[in-house]
Amino acid sequence: MTHSVEKFLASYLPIGGLAAYSVEFPNAVLVSECLTKSLYPASTAQMLTHVVQVGRTLLSCGEQAAQYCWTFEGHRVHVASRTDGVCLALLVENNPNVQMARVQEVLQGFIDLPEV
């Protein structure tokens, strides 16, 4: 993982309700981490990659950064997409105890990082 991303993520973690995260370049996964024992790490990483890829296809933002969310029965996937094509995907439990303000801070902070 690049030092700037590693330092950035370390400054925000842990976040209540965060089950997994992934940082993805347009053609490669930089890091994928499953933070709960209730999910399989390989399946979780694959799902996050697919959500990011579908988001890139459906919501191509070009020169602008974007944030989007896919909602499932038990989880939500929040994605921050930077103008350089790097994305941060957060798999968050779908319950009222999640620290959503913290999740939003991470997403916006990732978009605002000067370099990845």
Give residue ranges: language-model regions:
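Non-catalytic interaction/Regulatory regions outside core domains
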Residues: 1-25, 30-116
